[in-house]
Amino acid sequence: ITKDFDALMKYIKRI
């Protein structure tokens, strides 16, 4: 898993 993907998932979870 890439850092960008992990950050993206975290961003989506924030919503």
UniProtKB/Swiss-Prot annotation:
For this UniProt record, give its keywords in alphabetical order, as a comma-separated list: Secreted
The principal localisation class reads secreted
Q: In which tissues is it expressed?
A: Expressed by the skin glands.
Which superkingdom does the taxonomy of this entry point to?
A: Eukaryota
**Localization (cell):** Secreted
An example of a Gene Ontology cellular component annotation for this protein is: extracellular region
Supply the name of the protein.
Skin secreted peptide 5
